[in-house]
């Protein structure tokens, strides 16, 4: 929550400004209405695919990972409903599979990484295997993830170690 406004003559009426937009209560916080018409969000990272039209994707603070078209040939421009949520949590990195843009790698807080298919809805989590029973992997809140520019099957992922997958994280 970044901002609160309390009506000076009616303390039951409060507006809450937060990472996802605004919440409005008229009963001192017992019930809230969230305005979903405001296109509000804070992206941590963004990426694009190579489709036509190309898509922008990225992780948003407290609002998961989203993907939408960069432009449209339809009158009225890009609509909010063109965007789709592909991963939950605090969204961070998102990157398309360079061989099949319907698959997107997505990461959320604490090193949670997975792959999501925008056509089928199929998803699965990816985690590097434990090195041994005594070594616990520690991930930064916003852990690193990258596609190898020379090998479409190789992705890198960071904890206190650099992890490398040569089979797209399978």
Model segments located where?
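Beta-propeller blade termini and top-face loops
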Residues: 1-170
């Amino acid at each position: 929550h970044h901002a609160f406004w309390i009506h000076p003559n009616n303390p039951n009426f409060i507006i809450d400004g937060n990472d996802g937009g605004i919440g409005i209560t008229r009963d001192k916080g017992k019930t809230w209405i969230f305005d979903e018409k405001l296109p509000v969000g804070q992206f941590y990272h963004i990426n694009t695919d190579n489709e036509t039209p190309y898509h922008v994707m990225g992780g948003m603070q407290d609002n998961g990972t989203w993907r939408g078209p960069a432009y449209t040939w339809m009158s009225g421009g890009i609509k909010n409903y063109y965007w789709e949520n592909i991963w939950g949590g605090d969204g961070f990195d998102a990157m398309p599979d360079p061989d099949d843009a319907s698959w997107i790698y997505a990461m959320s807080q604490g090193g949670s990484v997975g792959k999501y298919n925008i056509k089928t809805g199929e998803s699965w989590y990816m985690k590097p295997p434990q090195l041994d029973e005594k070594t616990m992997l520690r991930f930064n809140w916003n852990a690193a993830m990258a596609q190898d520019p020379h090998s479409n099957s190789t992705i890198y992922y960071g904890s206190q170690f650099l992890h490398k997958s040569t089979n797209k994280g399978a």
